[in-house]
A protein has these predicted regions:
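FAD-binding subdomain of flavoenzyme oxidoreductases
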Residues: 103-256, 453-455
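Activity-critical C-terminal alpha-helical subdomain
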Residues: 180, 427-460
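C-terminal substrate-recognition/cap domain of FAD-linked oxidoreductases
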Residues: 25-33, 220, 226, 230-404, ...
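Alpha-helix capping/hinge segments and adjacent helical runs
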Residues: 21, 410-422, 435, 450-454
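N-terminal flexible segment immediately upstream of the FAD-binding catalytic core
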Residues: 2-62, 79-112, 262-270, 317-345, ...
Length: 460
């Protein structure tokens, strides 16, 4: 065995002496922790630690400091942009899997909050809450872990009404690289006390500390929910209609766009018979039947004035479930439509009034570059994704497309990422987006993680 390999074997043995069977070197486990949802290659870590509690997290970090081995926190594995993989292939790296830390520690219905461990998924949390009349609203589509959602500042289909993770996390417990445990935030709706370190850690992608406890805000389950499915002659007209809805001040709960290619893939994948035209999925939540019927009526009038071809209203839970299944399955429907391809997902955000312009630009460069891509997203908050299918050897062209779209978004006062994070794939745009502030981000990283042990090579 080469000396380096022998040193690593001895090191892992010392880790196992502390954590025992919680440490895995199984090839299948390593492979599962060396990928995310869309990074084009697998980069396995040297070992995976399945932490059961804060003591395990601290013990793992102590070993990492002693051995000078970096660590990547891992939740449900639904991350994007290479956030979960080592910064380079073959780099010695440990994966800290938090999925066993999945308890609901406390629910306070009277205060509309719950305290959870990081490994619980949003679906599991809402199952635990089903008898309280409350729910956790942040819905990124994937059944992500709450800790991972906090680490990426996740958002999704309901953000337009309920906000993303920063708006729905009241407090955090984090373990720093030096093993110190910090408790950030208080279980209150607002505070003006001190610097907001809680929000600094939300969206930090495990580069500043390991999240070990999350206090989340809960919301009443809406008594009445109606959903509209609205088809348009073109995707730009659909985007313009979405802006009209937002400008009307109607209390929309979800406002999602799926283009013609996305609808076609849904029809084939799920056996639906939707008209193969660009579509808006619009949802309203209300406490009274009369109010929601008024909202739906006004929305339908707005849509028809904006050029809608057809408006279908889903009033039953079965109809709504089928409709949102279609929206959430677009990615897998496209994978099914283009088998054997590599998939790149963009994540730009622009001010609401600029969404139609960026949608039109996206269509233009897809055509110019001769690429297959579907435009899907949360246009109610200015965020949409382009799902691009290319042969593996064309991955560089897909990244070129992504770069052109990011730079156009920045020109329109937007951002390179609304919810997926920077990871490995968008670091090149950080200076362009943040200017001199990027150096202060580097200083913060050095302050919290002076040895660069926590998810190195990401964001900065």
């Amino acid at each position: 065995m080469p000396k380096e390999g022998m040193r690593m074997a001895v090191s892992i043995a010392t880790l196992k002496s502390v954590l025992g069977e919680k440490v895995s070197e199984s090839a299948s486990v390593l492979e599962a922790h060396g990928r995310d949802e869309n990074f084009p290659e697998v980069r396995p870590p040297m070992a995976v630690v399945f932490a059961a509690d804060v003591a395990d997290v601290r013990a793992t970090l102590a070993w990492c400091r002693e051995q000078c081995v970096p660590l990547i926190p891992f939740g449900a594995g639904t991350s994007l942009e290479g956030s979960l993989v080592p910064y380079e292939a073959g780099a010695p790296m440990l994966s800290l899997d938090l999925s066993r830390m999945r308890r609901v520690l406390e629910v306070q219905p009277e205060n509309f909050l719950a305290v959870v461990e990081p490994g619980i998924t949003r679906t599991a949390l809402n199952t635990e809450l089903r008898h309280t009349g409350l729910f956790f609203p942040v819905d990124p589509g994937a059944d992500a872990s709450i800790g991972g959602m906090a680490a990426t500042n996740a958002s999704g289909t309901t953000t337009v009404r309920y906000g993303g993770m920063r708006q729905n996390v009241l407090a955090l417990e984090v373990v720093l690289a030096n093993g110190e445990v910090l408790r950030l935030g208080r279980p209150v709706r607002k505070t003006s006390s001190g610097y907001d370190l809680k929000d600094l850690f939300i969206g930090s992608a495990g580069t500043l500390g390991v999240i070990t406890r999350v206090t989340v805000r809960l919301h009443p389950v809406p008594e009445h929910v109606h959903t509209l499915r609205v088809f348009f002659p073109s995707i730009v007209e659909a985007a313009q209609a979405a802006y009209a809805v937002m400008a009307s001040a109607l209390p929309v709960a979800r406002l999602e766009l799926v283009d013609e290619l996305g609808i076609r893939s849904i029809n084939r994948y799920l056996g639906r018979g939707y008209e193969e035209k660009p579509c808006l999925f619009v949802e309203f939540h209300s406490s009274t039947a009369a109010a929601i019927e008024d909202e739906v009526r006004l929305a339908e009038e707005l849509m028809r004035e904006a050029g809608a071809l057809d408006v279908a209203v889903a009033r039953t839970s079965e109809e709504r479930t089928a409709q949102w299944e279609a929206r959430h399955q677009v990615y897998w429907a496209l994978v099914n439509l283009f088998p054997g391809q590599t998939y790149t997902i963009t994540d730009t955000v622009v001010p609401l009034a600029r969404v139609p312009e960026l949608v039109a630009y996206t269509q233009e460069i897809l055509g110019e570059m001769g690429m297959e891509g579907s435009i899907v997203g949360h246009v109610g908050d200015g965020n949409f994704h382009t799902l691009i299918a290319t042969p593996r050897e064309d991955y560089a062209r897909a990244q070129e497309f992504s770069g052109r779209l990011v730079r156009r978004a920045l020109e329109l006062d937007g951002t390179s990422t609304g919810e997926h994070g920077i990871g490995l794939t968008k670091r090149a745009y950080m200076a362009e987006e943040h200017g001199a502030a990027l150096e202060w981000m580097r200083r913060l990283k050095a302050l919290f993680d002076p040895d660069n042990l926590l998810n190195p090579g990401k964001i900065l």
